[in-house]
Swiss-Prot record:
Disulfide pairings: none
GO CC terms, sorted: mitochondrial matrix
Listed name of the protein: Chaperonin HSP60, mitochondrial
GO molecular-function term, one example from the UniProt record: ATP binding
Length: 47
C-alpha cells in the first residue's frame, strides 16, 4: 500500500486588513493558475 507524506500547516487566524490582504494574495494566485490552463474552449482547469 502506498502512503503519501502530507504535511498540513497549522491554523493561522487573521483579522482586519491583514486578513483581507492575505485572502487577496491567495485569490490572485488561484486566478493566475487557472487563467493559464483554461485551454481553447475554457472547459479544462488544472491546478
Amino acid at each position: 500500500m502506498l502512503r503519501s507524506a502530507v504535511r498540513l500547516a497549522g491554523k493561522d487566524v487573521r483579522f482586519g486588513e491583514d486578513a483581507r490582504r492575505s485572502m487577496q494574495k491567495g485569490v490572485t494566485r488561484a486566478v493566475a493558475a487557472v487563467a493559464t490552463t483554461l485551454g481553447p474552449k475554457g472547459r479544462n482547469v488544472i491546478i
